[in-house]
A protein has these predicted regions:
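Short, intrinsically disordered C-terminal tails of secreted or membrane-associated proteins
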Residues: 179-192
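Acidic/histidine-rich alpha-helical segments that form the ligand environment
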Residues: 66, 80-137
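A structural signal for well-ordered alpha-helices, especially hydrophobic packing surfaces
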Residues: 21, 28, 35, 54, ...
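Helix-loop segments that flank and shape redox-cofactor active sites
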Residues: 4-12, 27-52, 117-130
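Disorder-to-helix initiation segments
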Residues: 1-20, 98
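Basic polycationic patches enriched in arginine
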Residues: 171-173
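Conserved alpha-helical segments that form or flank metal/cofactor-binding pockets of metalloenzymes
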Residues: 42-81
Length: 193
């Protein structure tokens, strides 16, 4: 292995990075979707914030993939591969209220941060300090995005999101249930460890 990390650890770490990469791509596209389709009195501020957040997400895709390759693992190969690994739900609704956009992105960022922490723990436990260090930065960026979304919610009447629980292997609980005519996705177990 190019990194000196045990082959079994490389497989697990690369698999966790592939899932994170799929999640980041899914969140990037959802963020751009909402950036393109937001409307209402807070259009400009939300539109600009979401554009910046989408750019930040896209900026970490290459480092995630290249880190998997640098340790001797593989990464995503196609849109289909991405779709099979992503856990964040897509949102194909024709209309989403701005407050629901912010709420959904907030919960998705929180879920992503939880998964990143699980990957960080995996890396630390397998002696991959470099990947763990990169994940620390990505966790910080994800928490910052969530903070921006939460701070923006007060302007559109969504202070109820503070304290909404999210667990590592599931979608958010009953504190927020948007109704897009689609049933919420079922809980999924994480398989990083």
């Amino acid at each position: 292995m190019p990194s000196g990390i045990a082959e079994s650890a490389v497989r697990k770490i690369a698999a966790s990075l592939a899932v994170l990469l799929a999640e980041v791509f899914a969140l990037y596209l959802k963020t751009k979707n909402f950036h393109w389709h937001v409307s209402g009195p807070h259009f400009r501020s939300i539109h600009l914030m979401l554009d910046k957040q989408a750019s930040d997400l896209l900026a970490i895709t290459n480092p995630i993939a290249e880190r998997a390759r640098a340790i001797g693992g593989n990464t995503l190969r196609s849109i289909g591969h991405t779709a099979r690994l992503q856990r964040l739900a897509d949102n194909d609704a024709e209309f989403v209220k701005p407050e629901d956009m912010l709420a959904e992105l907030s919960l998705d960022n929180r879920s992503l941060a939880i998964r990143m922490r699980a990957a960080h723990q995996l890396c630390e436990g397998r002696g991959d300090t470099a990947t763990a260090s990169l994940l620390e930065n990505w966790i910080d960026e994800t928490e910052r995005r969530n903070w921006e979304l939460l701070e923006s919610t007060d302007d559109v009447g969504m202070s109820f999101l503070v304290g909404c629980p999210v667990s590592a292997g599931s979608r958010p609980g009953p504190c927020y249930q948007p109704n897009y005519g689609v049933a919420p996705p079922s809980a999924v177990a994480m398989y990083f460890v």
